[in-house]
From Swiss-Prot:
Changing residue 6 to A: Loss of plasma membrane localization. SUPFAM superfamilies: Protein kinase-like (PK-like). The keyword ATP-binding applies. The modification Phosphotyrosine is found at residues 147, 248. This is Serine/threonine-protein kinase CDG1. It comes from Arabidopsis thaliana (Mouse-ear cress). Activated by phosphorylation at Ser-234. It is found in: Cell membrane. Residues 74-354 form the Protein kinase domain. The keyword Transport does not apply.
Amino acid sequence: MVSCLCFRPSRKTKLKDKSHKRSIRNQTSSSSAQPAGTAKEVDSSSSQTVVQDSSRYRCQIFSYRELAIATNSFRNESLIGRGGFGTVYKGRLSTGQNIAVKMLDQSGIQGDKEFLVEVLMLSLLHHRNLVHLFGYCAEGDQRLVVYEYMPLGSVEDHLYDLSEGQEALDWKTRMKIALGAAKGLAFLHNEAQPPVIYRDLKTSNILLDHDYKPKLSDFGLAKFGPSDDMSHVSTRVMGTHGYCAPEYANTGKLTLKSDIYSFGVVLLELISGRKALMPSSECVGNQSRYLVHWARPLFLNGRIRQIVDPRLARKGGFSNILLYRGIEVAFLCLAEEANARPSISQVVECLKYIIDHTIRKERRTRRRLLGGNKDGAGTSRSPDETMMRMLEEEEEYVTSEEAIERRRVIVDDARTWAGMNRRGATPPTPTP
């Protein structure tokens, strides 16, 4: 992998209220351990506990009437999204503050558990790349969560089914979104104590503010990670098709590396412009609908350009070498063996490297185009000729035997790491 795999350990942030930390751990464990249809109903006293302790969690209790007024009685014109556990409305408080209100589905017990986990998690966890919780409503049978309003919607809204006139995201914006999401995940994994497994990372759960700054949302499936003497958390498999790590989908064993796999899928979506579970219309014959299965052989065979989103290719503004590096990072995260995947801190450093070099390339290209250029014989070249030559140089590298062999070495390194971890040996340092 590239030299940016070096990273600095993150500072831990402990959840100071230990009694409530245990309470949340119990709530998150109970939210998934029971098989569907047999889970014990969460009684209203659990929700009342949240209400009574709201001052300790720095969030506001809203009345149902207050939120109904804010959302114009939850009418369709206020509707901004639907999810697996509820419907989201845009609202405006009497203070003028814009908000997003998620009304949890009353038809299932799981919705009440989701409510408890989400409110408690977001009350304790605060980071610039996590959505901010304003408060909640637990009045009667109503369960509503109130967030900051994110004006640009989700990443999913900017990748698929674009409206007429809607611009596709450029390379730098896509990589900045990936970096912000990775930083949010790094906070959950490295700074929260105990670590938090997000468990529901996908493009529809990454929201964007007016500057395309991403924030992770929807924490109803989040769980505390394993304690020091355990390698994983065993739980009922939940999540979205196309994003679940294979070891979690097959065995229910959940680790921080399960989130890394999901992040790899998101990064691959950002680069390819394809859904994690592709429509059958995009598949040929018996081809798998899973994006990962579609893209992996293309990556291994050096057919990088077939992976990239055509809209991204048309916009330009990126280097073929950096595109190749981005896909490398995605497939490191998508290693079949959990122990072969990088940590989220390593992923953050890799993405910083890619963005830094993207910005440098922009500046270098601008200087060359504005200042003109000359070939080796001293003959001036036009801006178009200069750009064409730069693209040819990059293409020569990406399709070279060296680059193809490098891809195979990355896969071999991942397998070596996984094998040695299974045997309890110390794995070697990844190839730089």
